[in-house]
């Protein structure tokens, strides 16, 4: 572990819609508590119809006014369904009101029936989601860097689009120009791919990360740290080949976990939670691949293993009804093991 580890919490902005004891006010309070407990960042997810949750940019705006230090991130924003000009304007505003604390985690959208239906409802062709995603990030990044963009793509054609009309003091820009962007890649989250397919998927994923982002956001299979090592090795090699410093690439892992007094009780609670939260995915993915479940020591051992594989930022999603209790226990009993 050469880099200092950073710990964030995903506040689980879907939970207030399914758990009456964790309403939206409690979620905002928890963001403040996370800052007080020593977390480095707080994160929210994004899903409009597939798994409905409170809208992430609005939530982070509210959190920005109640916190001073923690970074504010999305894990992750489904950029393929967002208008790139609006995304740039909204994110620049968030970065300004938070005084430059944002991290934009972005993904294309998973290949699930419910996600396909979401694209259909929004009038977007699911088959084009990768192209829509890439063009969205290219355009938004340019607007958040220079305040203007010209772009001639497959899905977007923009000429002299600018956040400056000539009457303002200057273009509408974020504090960070641009804010850091983490690109999601989980090329091996499902089994059954041949070695050639895996290699091709990994090559494309690394290329996309380097073209569009400043780092890699993943939720690779939790029993396979070698998958992180393998993709990170490819990512670092490709970065060097393109003249970028590999050490400047952030590697963030969003991990779903559950801390219990014993492994048996923790697993039972976690299984029930995942089945209710992810009814489709829970049927096809091994429960053990979601993340570490067990005692404080077991959770810490898992983090150490993946830190050695190259992860420098852990975004913790707690698979439990008691979000605040899990967050506090992790901060007080797990995080000190990794602090100087």
Model-assigned labels for residue ranges:
Residues 1-340:
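Active-site-adjacent structural elements that line small-molecule/cofactor binding pockets in enzymes
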């Amino acid at each position: 572990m050469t880099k200092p580890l950073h710990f964030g919490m995903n506040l689980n902005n879907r939970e207030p819609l399914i758990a009456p004891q964790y309403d939206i006010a409690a979620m905002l309070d928890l963001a403040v508590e996370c800052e007080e407990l020593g977390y480095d960042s707080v994160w929210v997810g994004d899903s409009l119809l597939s798994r409905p949750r409170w809208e992430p940019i609005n939530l982070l705006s509210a959190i920005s006014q109640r916190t001073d230090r923690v970074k504010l991130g999305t894990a992750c924003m489904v950029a393929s369904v967002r208008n790139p000009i609006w995304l740039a304007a909204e994110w620049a505003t968030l970065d300004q009101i938070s005084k430059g604390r944002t991290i934009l985690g972005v993904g294309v959208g998973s290949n699930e029936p419910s996600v396909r239906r979401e694209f259909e409802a929004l009038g977007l062709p699911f088959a084009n989601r990768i192209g829509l995603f890439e063009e969205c990030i290219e355009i938004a990044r340019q607007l958040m860097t220079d305040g203007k963009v010209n772009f001639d793509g497959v899905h977007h054609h923009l000429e002299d689009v600018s956040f400056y009309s000539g009457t303002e003091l200057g273009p509408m820009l974020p504090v960070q120009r641009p804010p850091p962007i983490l690109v999601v890649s989980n090329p091996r989250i499902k089994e059954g791919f041949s070695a050639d397919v895996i290699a091709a998927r990994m090559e494309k994923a690394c290329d996309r990360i380097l073209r569009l982002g400043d780092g890699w956001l993943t939720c690779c299979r939790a029993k396979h740290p070698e998958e992180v090592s393998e993709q990170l090795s490819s990512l670092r090699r490709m970065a060097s080949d393109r003249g970028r410093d590999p050490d400047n690439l952030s590697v963030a892992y969003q991990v779903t976990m559950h801390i219990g007094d014993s492994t048996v009780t923790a697993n039972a609670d976690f299984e029930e939670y995942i089945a209710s939260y992810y009814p489709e995915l829970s049927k096809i993915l091994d429960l053990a691949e979601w993340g570490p479940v067990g005692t404080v020591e077991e959770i810490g051992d898992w983090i150490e293993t993946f830190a050695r594989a190259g992860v420098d930022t852990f975004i913790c999603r707690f698979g439990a009804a008691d979000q605040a209790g899990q967050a506090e226990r992790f901060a007080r009993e797990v995080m000190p093991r990794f602090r100087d």
